[in-house]
Amino acid sequence: VAAQQVLKHQRDMLEAAQAAYELGQRMVTVGNWSKLQLSPVQLAASNARMNLRRAQQAAAQAQANLVKTMGQTGLQDGFALPDQLPAIPVQPMTAAELQKRAEAVRSHLPDAESLRNRALSKSAMNVYWAAHALAQDSQGDILKTREFITEETVLHYNGMLKSVWDLLDEVRNQSQATVDAIGAQRDFWIAETDLQWVLQGGEPDSFVSLGGVGGDTPAAAGH
């Protein structure tokens, strides 16, 4: 789901970068710009194309992994994905709540497994809380501020107070902020899944690495 969401916004960024490059080419043709001035715009368009290709590959790989998983569990027929990830909870689970659940699980485990679960629970909780904080920040102040800047840029452009370059740059910035927010949201739900697994006695090989934006961050082994 996250990979498909990211793919859409990578297309938006490429469209804006390509529009800027085409405008720059016209300015070079009529003599208003030099090729040196065009070069950064050309690089931005090339980078946007590369990012789109990465996003396309990530989306295809995520789809293939999902089909494989559904096939292994006998659910390959008739499943459908939502258009977007669910919203993160306003408040994360508390330390007291999680400790109570963790202790209940450990009381049923052999001593060696109980010790491993204690360490895993601490790590899983820390990643969970960090992922929640990052997702809140990226979807809260950061994204809202970027949306405000975009709206103001459009108004200034319509009033001829901003250039088309300013507008195209802001479209790219807005799309990138959205991609980052989707990545943080995805990371939270992976961290939450890892935590729930540990609280059932599971032992993931690793936890999600926070900060990826491409939709292809692997879940812990065993999911």
Region locations from a protein language model:
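Soluble, cytosolic/nucleoplasmic coiled-coil alpha-helices used as oligomeric scaffolds and tethers
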Residues: M13, A19-A20, M27, S34, ...
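Acidic, low-complexity, intrinsically disordered peripheral segments
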Residues: G74, S114-N117, S121, D180-H223
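Short segments within alpha-helical structural elements
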Residues: A2, N47-Q72, T145-G201
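Short, highly charged low-complexity linear segments
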Residues: F79-L85, E147, D166, S206-D216
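Periplasmic alpha-helical coiled-coil/stalk elements that build and connect Gram-negative outer-membrane
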Residues: V1-E103, A131, N173-Q174
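Amphipathic, soluble alpha/beta structural segments
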Residues: A95, V127, A131-L134, S138, ...
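Sec/SRP-type N-terminal targeting helices
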Residues: R11, L36, P40, A104-E151, ...
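Short, electropositive, low-hydrophobicity segments enriched in small/polar residues
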Residues: K35, L75, S163-V164, D205
